[in-house]
Amino acid sequence: MSKVCEYYFAPQSPWAYLGHTRFVSLAKQHGVQIDIKPCDLGKVFNVSGGLPLAKRAPQRQAYRLVEMKRWSDHLQVPLNLQPKFFPLPGDPAAKLIIATKLAHGNDAALEVAGAVMRALWAEDKNIGDTDALAAIASACGHD
């Protein structure tokens, strides 16, 4: 029986971005198949008591930036702490990732997910824009 890990994440999450490459690498190293499943953090917040970033106390917002910088440095993953196009809904990016999974499989979807998150958090691109997403998919070799 093969090992499968269901990977729930939000494409616009800085934490998903920071951990994505390491997670995929660890799964491959240990023979674990990843079943990629983008999700809507807004719906998770509504049922779990979490707060969207804009509704958090200023102190928590500031500490979030400190932690993101610390983890970015520790993992040596480039990260723009305040990207031009954040916050934004993750639905368009999630739909691209799901479409890639259905058309080309999990590995292709994992590649596209990494590229989407890198585009937002390291390249200052708008992953809510369909033209930007089409360019990301094309750069990954998908139409």
Question: What kind of feature is each model-predicted range?
Answer:
Residues K125-I127:
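Helical "substrate-binding/catalytic lid" subdomain
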Residues P11, Y17-E123:
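Structural alpha/beta surface segment adjacent to cysteine/selenocysteine redox centers
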Residues M1-E6:
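Extreme N-terminal starter segment of soluble prokaryotic enzymes
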Residues S138-D143:
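Short, intrinsically disordered, charge-balanced linker/junction segments flanking boundaries
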